[in-house]
């Protein structure tokens, strides 16, 4: 689809020329990789290759097709691979991006030394070293595919036209799998000047499946009665499994490990059978037309059911209901009818069931034969078609007596192309972990089904024009067609799916595939008690009521967000145009998710909020609340000295309570909350803070303060040991961080505890960022010696920094105050994907403080840690207050938890 190829990045956009000047290259040596039969498969080194080490899925969706990021990629690389089938061309291409953080920054070097980081730099948001994009074309429109490749210069060794004045043709080799590798070889040579090297289809299929199942967290899903449920696969427990590829025929492959697989069975009754017989019997001209017919069918008009044999009764003695199919097409035997007397819709449905049920049964029997626990289905016949998946799922469920489930893959259409891509030497995908992949969905994802229409869009102006074109034409979001509930749904030898027809979709666009960004600097937060069972989202958006509520909240907040974003850039005509385009794009995302919650993978509130921020950045609103944050920071810094003086006059016990009250009171400042936005219109930031603090009365709705106080101050004359290092996850700018979290950090520093302030890598609403914190700390340090000395020790004050290795200047009584980025740009945080710097800082930490609704309530409220945890937040949403803590809006949470053993 036009406009889906690239996404805006605020750091990278102005750095393209520097990117093209990278001089790193990788020598391509030739290798031999063993095939399953023992015959070596030659892996060509004739074309430059990708270094996909530490790749990550982040970013842009090509509608249904994702992109992957390769951080360690050199310039001399392969840029694409294809799977050319009889009906579709699947193209996977690489786009290069680099991280441009300044490793010579003195402040960052100092913090890096303190954290013991020896490699890499301190920029912790995903390093956009590269992305893998997934695109598809219809095979009979191959010239459109070639035009796309040519327009993006993917066939050249250096695809970046700004890096040199003249670009030689890429006379190397492109890896291709599928039958079209032979058919179109001459056309590729003629049009693009490149040669095609064909890769074994089955090897590519297995390689692609292995990568997806290990590297993408929510890749596999089940599909029963129209409901999708994503399945978490443990990469260490993946093998062996059964891969069933349903194309024209069916191949059943037993996969035992990387490069270890065997075709153990198959059948000639597959997608080609359905299409061929269906075309003869119904006169349909296309596979999709035949599938559409099945939506309206009633197979009881053609299939012989158990009830037809036993007078409408069940055969209960052997467990068969009256609606069970006894014989596919069996009713046609006894009826004196010609072909024209039967409805094409009924024929299509009966044929679809007959073939799908048999594929499901044969697959299960092979899994049983080899003692396999998992069956994954893919191929042209599946194509994300909901009714086909439901039918196969019921077959596997029935024959296994509920002990096994059929599973499907979100990216299953690209297994071959991905495998061909991985056949290049030094492709680097082998070491990729799921926490290093981020999938993002660009503006066009809700509008089309993944096809490319015309040339790729070159810049933001073209993207906006594309959006405006849809509005002018009144184009609706492309939506899967709801199925009519079937009158009878008999299964061959087993029960029928219940008639949840309205939940079933007729086309493959029910699931979108995004752009996979490879981010090497993301890691799993090492202090999680059990990363395998960790679920960041507190609210279950699989619940329809919850999902509809939060989608509505985001929709209602959209006008205010657009106004703020446009105002942040001076209200220019350009800003207004981009604001309108953002509103349309994000509204389309919300509508898509309202219709199909699983369209972008497993849906959680954290994903929704991050999607909004990514959409803002796509339309170049880098920091919509910049001016608001600056104003609130200045106002808060002005009253900070009085607050610190007040705190210093208190006893230790009173001060600790006041500090926690201050954090909770200051957390009221949240531009993501409708209730709080209303408050902003009625008073100044200081007035609101004082009002909030005056209303602080214990007990709070969740009140573990006494336990926390005992841990901090001890009891019965017993002095507790001090914390070694505290990680403080901060939330909003202004009063929240300056009057709330900084005084709390100061208290820990006073006690000799190292403090690491953890903040967003990229802006999100009015959340403070790690880039902004040093200036805020510097402003606060002017009024406080404790903060000044700690900031100097932590490398935050550039003009007065202490060299950590300089013993003569080092104040042994001062604990350092440091700042690290968390690796994300969202109001929430998924601790399965944090920056490498945060992971390094966590290794010596024995206290985690999560502050704010996004990080402590929407996500991580139920998270358990290997160390102590303190979760502090004011609830600024009535529904969340009722659901989560059985309270009311503006109730407070102070949750202290000892280490989870």
UniProtKB/Swiss-Prot annotation:
Q: Which cofactor does it need?
A: Mn(2+); Ni(2+)
Q: Give me the stretches of Acidic residues compositional bias.
A: 1-10
BP GO terms, sorted: coenzyme A biosynthetic process
Reported tissue expression: Highly expressed in leaves and developing seeds. Expressed in roots, stems and flowers.
The pathway noted for it is:
Cofactor biosynthesis; coenzyme A biosynthesis; CoA from (R)-pantothenate: step 1/5
The catalysed reaction is: (R)-pantothenate + ATP = (R)-4'-phosphopantothenate + ADP + H(+); (R)-4'-phosphopantothenate + H2O = (R)-pantothenate + phosphate; (R)-4'-phosphopantetheine + H2O = (R)-pantetheine + phosphate; (R)-4'-phosphopantetheine sulfonate + H2O = (R)-pantetheine sulfonate + phosphate
Top-rank taxon = Eukaryota
Q: Where is this region: Disordered?
A: 1-50
Cofactor binding notes: Phosphatase activity is strongly promoted by several divalent cation ions but it is suggested s that Mn(2+) and possibly Ni(2+) represent biologically relevant metal ion cofactors for damage-control phosphatases.
Q: What is its EC number?
A: 2.7.1.33, 3.1.3.-
Question: CDD domains, per this entry?
Answer: ASKHA_NBD_PanK-II_Pank4
Asked if the Swiss-Prot or TrEMBL record annotates the protein with the keyword Transferase, the reply is yes
Chain positions covered by the region annotation 4'-phosphopantetheine phosphatase: 467-901
The Gene Ontology terms for molecular function here are: ATP binding; hydrolase activity; metal ion binding; pantothenate kinase activity
Comment on protein domains: Subfamily II proteins have an EGMGR motif about 50 residues from the C-terminus. This motif lies near the metal-binding residues in the putative substrate-binding cleft 2. Subfamily II proteins occur only in eukaryotes, in two forms: as a stand-alone unit in plants, and as a C-terminal domain of pantothenate kinases in plants, animals, and chytrid fungi.
**Which family, according to the similarity comment?**
In the N-terminal section; belongs to the type II pantothenate kinase family.
The free-text function statement in the UniProt record for this protein reads: Catalyzes the phosphorylation of pantothenate the first step in CoA biosynthesis. May play a role in the physiological regulation of the intracellular CoA concentration. Functionally redudant with PANK1. The phosphatase activity shows preference for normal or oxidatively damaged intermediates of 4'-phosphopantetheine, which provides strong indirect evidence that the phosphatase activity pre-empts damage in the CoA pathway. Hydrolyzing excess 4'-phosphopantetheine could constitute a directed overflow mechanism to prevent its oxidation to the S-sulfonate, sulfonate, or other forms.
Q: Identify the NCBIfam families for this entry.
A: panK_eukar (TIGR00555)
Q: Known PANTHER family for this protein?
A: PANTOTHENATE KINASE, PANTOTHENATE KINASE 1
From the Swiss-Prot or TrEMBL record, give the protein name: Pantothenate kinase 2
Gene name of this polypeptide: PANK2
């Amino acid at each position: 689809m036009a406009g889906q190829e690239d996404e805006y990045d605020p750091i990278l956009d102005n750095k393209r020329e520097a990117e093209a000047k990278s001089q790193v290259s990788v020598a391509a040596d030739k290798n031999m990789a063993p095939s399953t039969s023992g015959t070596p498969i030659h892996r060509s080194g004739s074309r430059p290759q990708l270094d996909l080490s530490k790749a990550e899925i982040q970013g842009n969706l090509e509608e249904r097709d994702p992109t992957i990021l390769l951080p360690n990629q050199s310039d001399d690389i392969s840029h694409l691979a294809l799977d050319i089938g009889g009906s579709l061309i699947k193209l996977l291409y690489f786009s290069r991006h680099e991280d441009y953080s300044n490793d010579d920054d003195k402040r960052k070097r100092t913090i890096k030394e303190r954290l013991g980081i020896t490699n890499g730099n301190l920029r912790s948001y995903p390093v956009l070293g590269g992305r893998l994009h997934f695109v598809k074309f219809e095979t009979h429109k191959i010239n459109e595919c070639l035009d796309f490749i040519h327009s993006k210069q993917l066939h050249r060794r250096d695809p970046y036209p700004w890096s040199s004045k003249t670009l030689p043709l890429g006379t190397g080799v492109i890896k291709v799998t599928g039958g079209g590798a032979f058919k179109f070889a001459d056309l590729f040579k003629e049009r693009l000047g490149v040669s095609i090297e064909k890769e074994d289809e089955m090897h590519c299929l297995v390689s692609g499946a292995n990568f997806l199942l290990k590297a993408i967290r929510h890749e596999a899903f089940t599909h029963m009665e129209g409901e999708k449920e994503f399945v978490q696969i443990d990469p260490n427990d993946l093998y062996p499994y059964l891969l069933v590829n349903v194309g024209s025929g069916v191949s059943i492959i037993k996969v035992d490990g990387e490069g270890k697989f065997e075709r153990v069975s198959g059948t000639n009754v597959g997608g080609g059978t359905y299409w061929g017989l269906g075309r003869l019997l119904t006169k349909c001209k296309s596979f999709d037309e035949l599938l559409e017919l099945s939506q309206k069918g009633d197979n009881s008009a053609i299939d012989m059911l158990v009830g037809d044999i036993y007078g409408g009764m069940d055969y209960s003695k052997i467990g068969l209901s009256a609606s069970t199919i006894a014989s596919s097409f069996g009713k046609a035997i006894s009826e004196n009818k010609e072909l024209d007397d039967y409805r094409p819709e009924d024929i299509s449905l009966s044929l679809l069931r007959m073939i799908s049920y048999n594929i499901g049964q044969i697959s299960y029997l092979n899994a049983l034969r080899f003692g396999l626990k998992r069956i994954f289905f893919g191929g042209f016949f599946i194509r994300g078609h909901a009714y086909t998946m439901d039918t196969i799922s019921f077959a596997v469920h029935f024959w296994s007596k509920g002990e096994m489930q059929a599973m499907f893959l979100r990216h299953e259409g690209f297994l071959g192309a991905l495998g061909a891509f991985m056949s290049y030497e030094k492709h680097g995908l082998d070491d990729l972990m799921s926490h290093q992949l981020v999938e993002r969905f660009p503006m066009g994802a809700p509008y089309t089904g993944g096809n490319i229409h015309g040339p790729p869009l070159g810049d933001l102006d073209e993207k906006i024009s594309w959006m405006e074109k849809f509005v002018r034409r009144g184009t609706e979001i492309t939506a899967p067609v709801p199925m009519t509930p079937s009158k009878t749904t008999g299964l061959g030898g087993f029960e029928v799916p219940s008639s949840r027809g309205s939940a079933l979709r007729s086309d493959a666009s029910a699931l979108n595939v995004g752009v996979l960004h490879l981010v090497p600097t993301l890691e799993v937060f090492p202090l999680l008690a059990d990363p395998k069972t960790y679920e960041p989202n507190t609210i279950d958006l699989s619940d329809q009521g919850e999902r509809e509520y939060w989608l509505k909240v985001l929709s209602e907040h959209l006008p205010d967000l657009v106004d703020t974003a446009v105002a942040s850039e001076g209200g220019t005509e350009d800003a207004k145009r981009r604001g309108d385009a953002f509103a349309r794009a994000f509204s389309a995302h919300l509508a898509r998710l309202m219709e199909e919650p699983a369209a972008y993978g497993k849906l959680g509130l954290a994903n929704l909020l991050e999607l909004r921020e990514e959409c803002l950045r796509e339309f170049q609103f880098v920091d919509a609340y910049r001016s608001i944050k600056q104003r609130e920071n200045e106002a808060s810094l002005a009253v900070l000295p009085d607050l610190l003086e007040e705190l210093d006059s208190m006893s230790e016990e009173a001060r600790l309570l006041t500090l926690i009250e201050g954090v909770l009171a200051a957390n009221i400042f949240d531009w993501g909350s409708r209730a709080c936005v209303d408050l902003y219109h009625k008073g100044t930031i200081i007035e609101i803070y004082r009002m909030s603090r005056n209303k602080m009365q214990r007990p709070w709705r969740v009140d573990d303060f006494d336990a926390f106080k005992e841990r901090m101050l001890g009891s019965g004359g017993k002095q507790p040991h001090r914390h070694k290092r505290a990680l403080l996850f901060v939330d909003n700018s202004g009063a929240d961080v300056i009057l709330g979290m900084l005084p709390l950090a100061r208290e820990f520093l006073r006690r000799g505890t190292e403090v690491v302030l953890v903040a967003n890598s990229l802006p999100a609403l009015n959340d403070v960022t790690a880039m902004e914190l040093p200036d805020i700390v510097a402003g606060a340090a002017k009024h406080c010696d404790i903060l000044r000395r700690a900031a100097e020790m932590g490398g935050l004050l550039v003009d007065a920094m202490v060299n950590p290795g300089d013993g003569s200047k080092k104040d042994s009584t001062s604990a350092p105050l440091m700042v690290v980025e968390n690796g994300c740009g969202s109001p929430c945080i998924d601790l399965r994907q944090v920056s490498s710097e945060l992971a390094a800082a966590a290794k010596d930490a024995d206290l985690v403080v999560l502050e704010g609704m996004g990080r402590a309530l929407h996500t991580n409220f139920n998270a358990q840690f290997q160390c102590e945890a303190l979760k502090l937040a004011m609830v600024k949403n009535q529904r969340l207050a009722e659901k989560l803590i059985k309270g009311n809006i503006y109730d407070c949470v102070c949750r202290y938890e000892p280490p989870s053993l």
